């Protein structure tokens, strides 16, 4: 991404994939690939520097729009984010004022969920993961019901382990006190002692694999 500077301020933003006219002169799009940065700067075109210092994971936060700043002394154009807002970790319910104003669906009361929080969303995803894993061995259960063929003990043990891990994950998510705590559960870190081989894990853990 580029910016065109005119009279000391940003005049327009450029994608860098098409030609441009600056003043009375038309330039082909190859100025973005063949020209040096200094040469582009001389006609007022600057590559935008992305400052992602305050940008956060959009699974857990709502980032602000970027603010673009031209620094004439430094000869740079920088795009920066403001402070991100954490997404709600708990469900929000309709308020009486919203219900009275007709904003809520028919039949809703102050206990009706208006928007799901991250806890609800993440717990549902964990349940779906567990269901998808168990689905691969469901045929053993069907065969047992249809033909009374014994289910291998390894399969029984594995399926129980999946359900146990699912319950543990749900508990961890439920107990997370805020959005940063939920994010931490999913953040992979090196848990090995210094000098030992790297072991990358997340606090939430992983579902067991069959045969492991």
Locations of regions flagged by a protein language model:
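A preference for well-ordered globular domain cores
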Residues: 1-212
């Amino acid at each position: 991404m580029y910016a065109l500077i005119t009279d000391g301020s940003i005049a327009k933003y450029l994608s860098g994939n098409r030609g441009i006219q600056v003043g009375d002169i038309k330039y082909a799009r190859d100025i973005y690939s063949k020209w040096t940065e200094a040469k582009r700067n001389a006609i007022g075109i600057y590559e935008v520097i992305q400052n992602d210092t305050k940008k956060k994971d959009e699974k857990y936060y709502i980032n602000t729009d970027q603010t673009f700043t031209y620094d004439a002394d430094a000869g740079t154009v920088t795009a920066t984010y403001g402070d991100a807002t954490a997404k709600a970790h708990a469900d929000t319910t309709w308020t009486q004022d919203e219900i009275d104003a007709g904003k809520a669906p028919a039949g809703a009361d102050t206990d009706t969920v208006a928007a799901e929080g991250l806890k609800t969303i993440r717990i549902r995803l964990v349940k779906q993961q567990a269901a998808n894993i168990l689905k691969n061995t469901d045929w053993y259960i069907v065969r047992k019901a249809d033909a009374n063929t014994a289910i291998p003990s390894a399969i029984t043990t594995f399926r129980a382990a999946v359900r146990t891990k699912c319950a543990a994950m749900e508990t961890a998510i439920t107990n997370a006190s805020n959005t940063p705590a939920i994010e931490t559960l999913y953040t992979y870190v090196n848990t090995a002692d210094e000098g030992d081989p790297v072991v990358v894990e997340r606090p939430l853990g992983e579902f067991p694999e069959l045969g492991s």
